[in-house]
Amino acid sequence: VKLSRVVWLVVLILIIAGLTYFFYPPFRLFTFVVAGRSPVCPLGEAVKAPDNLRRQVEYKDQILRASRLVEEDPKGFELWQTPNGRYWIPAGSRYVLPFNLAEQERKIYGTGDFGPHAGDITLDCGANVGVTVHEELAAGAKTVVAIEPAPENIECLRRNYASEIQSGRVIIVSKGVWDRDDFLTLRVDPKNSAADSFVIHREGAVDVDKIPLTTIDEIVADLKLPRVDYIKLDIEGAEPKALAGARETLAHYKPRISIATYHEPDHPRVIPELIRAAQPGYEMRCGPCAETDHALRPDVLYFK
């Protein structure tokens, strides 16, 4: 009888634990950390993952409702008025802009010690149409080098920052960042201008041949930049390649870095290794985390 009671008690505990796992996300995420399925995300960031998703959707929907189409260009561009200002975007990507603006509301690329500062010279790698360029300028950056390979995004950058380009505060580099000078095929997503990639194959993407690539080190040398204070890297899976071409810049200037780590499963491990190989003095902090495939991964990592 006693054994039977023990068995039933164990079964009851397992049922309660199972229900809690599925219906109470913080407990599930806690188990990921305990089980080693969150090798980079600390417990404090891990339990925020459901709220990160909720806030992203909430902000995106708010921005979308508050935005309106101002102008359509038959060349394939649209001008939108948003709560965060006016932006030219590629036609077909109208739902991408609110999503990217929502990410900035959440400050996913960091603030304070890990974000852009007043007087900075920044490299915005994967500038897209300029949402993060706006954030860097708003923080008081002296010079923003907007690096973007996709032709339609480059045109939007030129329209969105015409006056800043004229004054020299924004410099556009119409190339991708890689580990060497080269020309590669860029896979352009006609429905998501933020998903164009040299390395990720997405269904429906259109190949654009002979897109030029260069390295961060060469950009710094070619522009004769006196220093680099901050780098944002979100380039659809090519982040390790870009870091391999930035060793001198990281070693000499030790810029603050905000880097996307969600494109490939091994990036949360590989990216810190590459950064510290170039400059061992970097301190790392985990940014917002997300649940994926019964594990937790950081969307962004910060280095200073």
Feature names for model-found ranges:
Residues 1-304:
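Phosphate/nucleotide-binding beta-alpha loop and adjacent structural elements of enzyme active sites
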